[in-house]
Amino acid sequence: MPFIDDALLWCPDNDGRLVGGLDLATCITDDSTVDAENINPTIGANSSTLQQQQQLQQQQLQQQQLQQQQQQLQQLQQHQQQQQQQQQSADLCGSAARNVNVVVEPLCGSDSSDELFRTLSESNFEIESLLSDLATVEVKVENEENNNNNNSNVISDNDFAASQAAVVAGDDLLAKDNVQLSVQGLVDSVGARSADSGSGNGHGQALLAFGSATATATAASSRMVSFVTCRTTESMQINILFGFRLGFLLPCDLLNNNNNSNNNGSNGNGNGNGRCTPEESRFVTVTSASANPLLVEKLMSKCLNIDKRNDKLDDTEIPIVKQSTSPSPHQQQQQHQHQQQQQQQQQQHLQQTQQQQQQQQQQQQQQQQQQVFGSATTLLHIKTEQNALLTPLQQSQQQQQQQQQQQQQHSLQANNNAHQQQQQQQPLAIPHRPLLHNLLSGGAIHNPHHRNYTTATTGSFPPSPADSGVSDVDSSSSGGQPCADELKARLGMPTTAATSASAAAAAAAATHSAAAAAAAAAAAAAHLHTGTFLHPNLYQNNAANSLRNIWNRSVGVPDNYYGNSGSSSGGGGGGVGGVNPGTPGAPSYLTTSYFNAPAAASSQRSAAANGFGTHQHHSLQHQQQQQQSYAPQQQQQLSHHQQQQQQQQLHHQQQQQQQQQQQQHSQSQLAAAQLASTHPHQLHSTPHDTHSTIANAAAAAAAAAAASVVSSSSGRSGAISVAGSQSVIQQPATSSVNYDLSYMLELGGFQQAKAKKPRKPKLEMGVKRASREGSTTYLWEFLLKLLQDREYCPRFIKWTNREKGVFKLVDSKAVSRLWGMHKNKPDMNYETMGRALRYYYQRGILAKVDGQRLVYQFVDVPKDIVEIDCNGV
């Protein structure tokens, strides 16, 4: 097989210079005589034999080229259809197949070729070789003594194969002029493979080599080979890598695009728009003096997989290769096998990439699930660590007992339903609240009897959440249903939402969750039975939780606003207070702040006095009723997974309590009560849950385990002597805010509950709420009471205009202290109380008096109040 040797590029007459842009006609003696010495000295006498073999192979290869041409044309049409669907703008070039349409014309005598070689001569590279055998990886460098370049420009076979196609001039038609051979099949393969790479990543590259002989040139011109690299980007870019003066058969406009990276100018056919039509790119005619069929066949076979390796060539790398010998058929077979192996490796790599992506997606989903339940898991570990008396043996027992939890759920729920029915008939009668004079003078509690609402003493002003006397609140958060519920809770009536508790039970049953249904049934059966108000130090937990829950729902404070410090600080309350919590009847006072969960006080009361289990369970029922009545329809949103998790954790707490009871340690008993009482709120205080969902979930969990959790404090210490499986779990409030009415958390005496039937609600929405005599709760009522008491009027407060309802705070500090004593808030000051008074402006209870300090006006003054002469002191 003939080759283009370095002898064609090297001539002694050139003074040791590479041919570069010189005329090689002087190096070739005759254009009609093909001398082996001038053509290829390495071939020598064997050139004639190789030429005969080449003629036989050429005929066979031409038939193969025709077949491949048809197949590649079909592939090109398919790629073009895909490109037309993907590309919406004509400005995008798409692929090299549509951008490159080179019609080679003889340009031997044109001025553009001179400009081209002038440009190439100024470049920083030299031509080391014209042709390299593409089947071999090893690059053989000849004439190293004349090599002025380093080996950095030499690329391997695989890198050179990354170019899309090549047409190399042969030497069989050296003496023939104006002979044109169409190598459309090769160019079609260029278009087909360029469509894949060009449309995919915009970096498809095609390396085209053209060679020919013209009528005005000598036979040496057929030896010239030019390489063109075509890159497909947003704009057409054609880089002429190197070429020779007599050998370039490209148009001048194409050659001038050498260093223009964003040139959309004329292409080979002179379109002037930088783009080619599909028909033009499908048939690219290359005018050539000759073609080497064997090399063309190898190049065409090489370009089948070059689109998968085109990323090996850098955008600015110049593919210059050394000349080497011809490969044997065995080497070609090895090369074909190597290409198949590369294809298999690439397919495996793609499969691995897809598997990695799937694994990453699964990991992300697992991380999201961990984020959803991560908070509850963390709290579970914290609660376990707080119990310092838990041994490793007990921990192993807990793990075994957790596995048996599923078998015990049905019995827990059945016992819960039966126990709820027992507790329905045991409502709590709360002691009554003293009059204002007794409160201020330190008198004792007396005359516990029911008082009904009347408008004969204090008027008809509605109560307000601002009467807690803490700070400013949102005006839009008050009024409406929450306030009505608050009033009815104070009256000892079931709230209006209690009538829909049966609907909540039906909604819970729709979720196929027995625990939720049991909680809804317990909420329907439980009601408040509060008579009048207690002394501030004697407020029960259920009243505190009911008022806090109602007000917090109207404000919209998050459920984990203050966290749960009761489980840690309240647990050690017995030791800090200096009272043995195991001693019956010895009260263990709270050492926690006002904002701790009510569960802390409830658990300590349970461990400090006997016979309070009924009250605690009644309080639990009331809280469940409050939580269920707020959003009964949201019970459906509680997932079965959350309920199972709650029940499992409650069973876990039960096992901890039983193990601690065996240790017979009073401190461990108190800690277990704290741990059990604070569980439902801690389990669900995740930041992303809504407070209504948490309330329903916690209520369902507490109801499911209410009948099964046995008091751990009722062992030898006799802390709780309630018969049966009395529960000590006190459901904490779903939220804690500044308005939590902390005086309700104080300890005090309790009376045993009397069986009563629940009263039906009598007040509806929109009805003005009236207060009761001697139980002033709201700030405006408190001030109105002071104005009717000669002990304080006009000493601390007085009327300035009785008819208009204008009054003045004579001693604002004293009034604020009295209000703080009334609300059991010793840190109350006028600044805090004044914010509550200003809140009444928005409620329409008080009116602002301009220009006067400490002066306020009642909008609607009751006419039947006690008249006091405030003029004299």
Curated annotation (Swiss-Prot):
Main localization, broad class: nucleus
Localisation: Nucleus
GO cellular component terms given for this protein: nucleus
Induction description: The expression of this protein is developmentally regulated and is correlated with the 20-OH-ecdysone induced activity of puff 74EF.
Molecular function per GO: DNA-binding transcription factor activity, RNA polymerase II-specific; sequence-specific DNA binding
Gene3D superfamilies: Winged helix-like DNA-binding domain superfamily/Winged helix DNA-binding domain (1.10.10.10)
Region (Disordered): 321-346, 400-427, 439-485, 605-689
UniProt superkingdom: Eukaryota
Coiled-coil residue spans: 45-155, 330-426
InterPro entries per UniProt: Ets_dom, ETS_fam, WH-like_DNA-bd_sf, WH_DNA-bd_sf
Residue ranges of the annotated DNA-binding region, renumbered to this chain: 777-859
Record-linked Pfam families: Ets
Key words, A-Z: Coiled coil, Developmental protein, DNA-binding, Nucleus, Transcription, Transcription regulation
GO BP, sorted A to Z: cell differentiation
Protein task: Probably acts as a transcription factor during metamorphosis.
Family per record: Belongs to the ETS family.
Protein name per the record: Ecdysone-induced protein 74EF
Organism: Drosophila virilis (Fruit fly)
Gene it is expressed from: Eip74EF
